[in-house]
């Protein structure tokens, strides 16, 4: 899907999230907010990262995931298994990762405030995201 921001936009987020097959696809980028959808294969990860100046909201539409957070990668203080219709709120400055612990693709959407990725960012795979020089928050 093409990034529709910063113009006004409405969509059925469940349909858009479940239809997405890319690791990450940016649906909308505004001045202070960004919406992405993700599809993570079984055993795959979003990737450990820290957003120093971004809060993040994640909702799982389908699948089973382990959400870990903490001050640092080697100091995990939050570990929760989540599934369909669960959310995770990630404060700025927290290390976090999401691991698909289910047997099917994990389908989720994420809201960043402010925007985390360049408008129109699309990564077909985790490897594509890891190789993108614009993705500097992975740790």
Region annotations inferred by a language model:
Residues 26, 35-39, 57, 79, ...:
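Conserved hydrophobic/aromatic beta-strand scaffold that supports enzyme active sites
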Residues 48, 67-68, 90, 96-102:
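Short beta-strand His + acidic residue motifs that chelate non-heme Fe in jelly-roll/DSBH
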Residues 53-72:
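Glycine- and acidic-residue-biased ligand/ion/polar-headgroup-sensing regions
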Residues 35, 67-69, 108:
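Short hydrophobic/aromatic-rich beta-strand segments that constitute the beta-sheet cores
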Residues 57, 103-119:
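A short hydrophobic beta-strand segment most commonly corresponding to one strand
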Residues 72-92:
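Short acidic-glycine-tyrosine-enriched beta hairpin
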Residues 1-34, 47, 80-84, 123-139:
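A short, N-terminal "cap"/entry segment at the start of jelly-roll beta-barrel domains
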Residues 36-52:
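Conserved short histidine dyad/triad with adjacent acidic residue
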């Amino acid at each position: 899907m093409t990034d529709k921001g910063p113009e006004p936009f409405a969509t059925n987020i469940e349909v858009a999230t479940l239809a997405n097959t890319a690791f990450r696809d940016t649906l909308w980028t505004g001045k202070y907010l960004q919406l992405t959808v993700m599809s993570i294969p079984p055993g795959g990860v979003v990737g450990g990262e820290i957003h120093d100046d971004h809060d993040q909201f994640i909702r799982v539409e389908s699948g089973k995931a382990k959400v870990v957070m903490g001050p640092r990668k080697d100091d995990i203080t939050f570990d929760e298994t989540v599934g369909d219709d669960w959310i995770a709120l990630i404060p700025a400055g927290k290390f976090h990762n999401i691991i698909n612990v289910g047997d099917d693709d994990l389908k989720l959407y994420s809201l960043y405030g402010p925007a985390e990725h360049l408008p129109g960012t699309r990564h077909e795979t985790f490897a594509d995201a890891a190789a993108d020089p614009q993705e500097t928050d992975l740790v």
